[in-house]
Regions:
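Surface-exposed short loop/turn segments
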Residues: 92-150, 186
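C-terminal/domain-edge helix-coil "capping" segments
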Residues: 22-36, 132-198
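Envelope-exposed proteins and targeting segments
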Residues: 42-44, 75, 86-88, 137-142, ...
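Acidic helix-start/capping segments at beta-turn-to-alpha-helix junctions
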Residues: 80-100, 194-198
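N-terminal export leaders
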Residues: 3-11
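A structural "domain/chain start" motif
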Residues: 19-69, 73-75, 92, 190-198
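Soluble non-cytosolic domains of exported or imported proteins
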Residues: 55-66, 84, 136, 166-174
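Second-shell loop/turn segments in exported
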Residues: 50-60, 76-78, 131, 159-166
């Protein structure tokens, strides 16, 4: 009996800790999809199709395409071979927009304020507290699938999320996974989806 009383709280804390770790690897994204993927058509082979603006910075385009490859594979696509004509041309794009809100944007709800504060380490000092660095980053990826033979757009997806950090390549890959999570279905736009970081 005493042994159970000791292990039960430990197991509970371990479970809470594992749930917390799983939450750190989850990305929520707002997803919008459009298109008319032909019924019964398999995903097939693909090749990336770069716009002229993307060709001016090949290293950046390579990073975006590398982030999208895992999502395309999960959706059932495979890269076209060197001598193979692709079934689908894929255009991918990614952008991050930084915005910074001023602390006085909304004076009725401003968290700052002047006042006399007592600090143990400094005594009484005048301070202006508050979270003044409220930088937000909106990250967005887009995928456009075109029929290689006709050039007709078949499927378009956009996934976006925002946070207080710039993000990373793995976050970008997760956003591409979110963009193609429902492929080939289109759904109510926008909708929130959840994916794991790779």
């Amino acid at each position: 009996m005493r042994r159970r009383a000791v292990f039960a709280p430990a197991l509970l804390l371990a479970g809470i800790g594992l749930a917390g770790c799983a939450a750190l690897n989850t990305v929520y994204a707002d997803l919008s999809t459009w298109g008319d993927w032909p019924a019964g058509r398999a995903p097939g082979s693909y090749a990336f199709d770069r716009l002229p603006s993307q060709q001016s910075d090949p290293a950046a385009a390579d990073r975006v395409e590398a982030a999208a490859k895992r999502a395309l594979t999960a959706a059932g696509f495979r890269p076209a071979g060197a001598d193979e004509k692709p079934d689908v041309l894929v255009q991918v794009a990614s952008r991050t927009t930084r915005t910074g809100a001023d602390p006085w944007d909304d004076p009725l709800w401003w968290r700052g304020g002047f006042g006399l504060r007592r600090h143990v380490w400094a005594g009484s000092v005048w301070v202006m507290p508050g979270p003044f660095d409220r930088t937000r980053y909106e990250r967005q990826v887009a995928v456009l699938l075109r029929d290689a033979a006709s050039g007709r757009p078949l499927y378009e997806a956009r996934a976006a999320n925002e946070g207080s950090t710039l993000g990373s390549d793995s976050l970008q890959a997760a956003l591409f996974s979110a963009a193609l999570i429902d492929f080939p279905r289109v759904g109510p736009n926008p909708r929130t989806v959840r994916v794991a970081l790779p």
